[in-house]
């Protein structure tokens, strides 16, 4: 993982926690392409996130595409903090 991608993960997890979401790093347990994080709102609504290098430099593998298709609307690829904030506010209905 590149430094830029790790920094993005940390910043996005901080934002999620400020909104009261649990941020769970998913283990690489032999399932290739599994998303990086699971974000959970109280009550169970969940969003799987695959972080990609900021600036569009990250490549999506065939395995990552499989998981994106399998998880459907509860999966997103994120390459910016602003994009992440917008996604979680809309997905989890976090409007004030």
Please place each PLM-identified region on the residue numbering:
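Catalytic phosphate/metal-binding cores of nucleic-acid and nucleotide-processing enzymes, i.e., regions
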Residues: 1-96
């Amino acid at each position: 993982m590149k430094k830029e991608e790790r920094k993005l993960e940390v910043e996005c997890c901080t934002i999620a926690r400020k909104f009261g979401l649990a941020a769970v790093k998913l283990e690489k347990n032999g399932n290739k392409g599994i998303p990086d994080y699971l974000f959970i709102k109280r009550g169970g609504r969940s969003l799987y996130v695959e972080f990609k290098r900021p600036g569009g430099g990250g490549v999506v593998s065939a395995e990552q595409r499989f998981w994106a298709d399998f998880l459907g609307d509860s999966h997103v690829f994120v390459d910016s903090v602003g994009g992440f904030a917008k996604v979680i506010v809309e997905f989890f209905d976090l409007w004030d």
